[in-house]
Amino acid sequence: MPKKYIFPSELSWLSFNDCVLQEAADKTNPLYERIKFLAIHSSNLDEFYRVKISDLHSIPEKSNLFEKVNKEINRQQNTFGSIWKKQIIPELQENKIIYYENQSLLPLHTEEIDSYFKTTILSYIQIVYLSEDENQEYFLNNRQLYLLIRLKNTNGEITYCYINIPADKLNRYKLLSPVKGKNYIISIDTIIKKCLHYIFPDQKTSTAFAIKLNRDENYLIEDEASGNLVSKIKKKLQERKSGSSTRFLYDFNMPEVMRKLCKNAFHLKDYEMIEGGTHHNFFDLFKFPNPNFPDLQNENFPPLKYFPFETKKSIFEVIGEENQLLHFPYQSYHYVLQFFNEAAIHKDVTEIKVTLYRISSQSLIANALISAAKNGKKVTVFVEVKARFDENNNLFWANEMQRAGIRIIYSMPNLKVHAKVALLTLKNAGKTKNYAYLSTGNFNENTAETYTDFGFFTSQKEYTDDLKQVFRFFKTKEKNYPISNLWVAGFNLKENILQHIDIEIQNVENGKKGAVFMKINGLNDKEIISKLIEANNAKVEITLIVRGICTLLPGINGYTENIKIYRIVDRYLEHSRIYRFHNDGAEKIYLSSADMLSRNLNRRIEVAFPIKDKKNHAGD
């Protein structure tokens, strides 16, 4: 029997996506920001089908949960469609932006789309005819958009085929010429539908319906410890392209005969066939064109300059004097880039060590590391090639860095390195000094513009000595190194969190105040949940801000009545992790890369670091 204070993780995740949908419906948000929230919702749901749904229908005891999940997804999809059709499109029209769907085109726009189709779109079109032979094999690419087409020739003969919509090659939405003060936008889906007569000139009629297939992109390497792990990952990445289907999305207008045809041709199960709208992949709305209406978007907030880094020529001079804490994107991420760029050319820098989990495709940091190696610095980079959906990008940069002479340490068996840390060694006049950067977020200058994270620079030995031990572990795989100041998953992180909650419990039992605050992205670890319930029953004040999955339900008498749980969904993606313990008034604050998820605490290397400077502590 499930515990009444536990909420299924799949439904919790969907509740987060529902919050995103609420932002899309919130008219206090600018119109194009609401369109962006629809794109986020669509992207999130697409990932849900790629990595989470397969387990539900493969485990018999989860069949009831599978039904609840489908019911919630259907509810959200109906809400999504209503927001798009009844709110967004009419409000676009109010702002003189016409989105073409089923309406007739103006003559000028007919000429434009004909030209664009013939010169550009048509070069990508591939036709696959469907036969009645059940032994014939057909393959739909994962997440690719297609049109399933019913053709009828002059003799009344009917054939079926499907063609690709090249949204992976071209912008999904095209801005057409303005007419009489109005702007016009059309999707390439609609352009193709209106130009089918160019593809099938001998057919009397043609009717097209949107289809799309999601495939399971979870992969499991049975034995990570033996053989070459990187080679195994590369093989799995190839296999992922042809993973089993998890969702076949089709236009709700599609006739039953065509649905049956799809089921047979693509070997689909009933539960995989899901009714959708006339268009799929709404995450392409990220690039929905804005003709020139800045007031329909959020006002631009340029990041603040950080004065201490502006007053000295060398960033190391500033860090050497005092610890420095930055909050992104409110403060500029350029200082992180400056840290690595200056290290690459600084005459005193002899060695650089860094962990890379998710880096940008055009990474300035990776390029700085390459320059450092070519400038004679000793550079060691731990590259996590098991970072989901970033495996290929990480492998690419690992190869580029290796070619430049950088020592690359790859993923470890049965363990992910999720820590975001760097350690630099400087030597001058016979003296050696280390500088460290620790962060809650990835070394990624692109996501740093939209994710809230903290970055901490220090040269204090209590931090740098512990980081030396962490990097030594990456090299030797041994854990017999003392780590005292940092909390490191796999070493002492979980134990320290449990111990500090125990201290708050003890303080309350001694008549003092006890309080725990955590801002995290997920909570499902059973030991942490049990300890929070114990603290709840001891009357410890517990406040949690959990962006994503949270399997703990607040307000359950006898378990969580003293626990407050909030979720923040807003302009920026909340990504930072903060642990705060009242500690009888001498509060302790840790920033971390780790959520309170079992995978973070038990199967990853994470680093939490204390913020001891009172100037960086917010008031109650």
Predicted regions and their residues:
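N-terminal localization/anchoring segments of enzymes in phospholipid and broader phosphate metabolism
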Residues: M1-G514, E534-A538, C550-D620
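Glycine/threonine-rich ATP-lid/beta-loop region of ATP-binding domains
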Residues: K526-I529, I533
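Hydrophobic alpha/beta core scaffold segments
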Residues: E541-I545
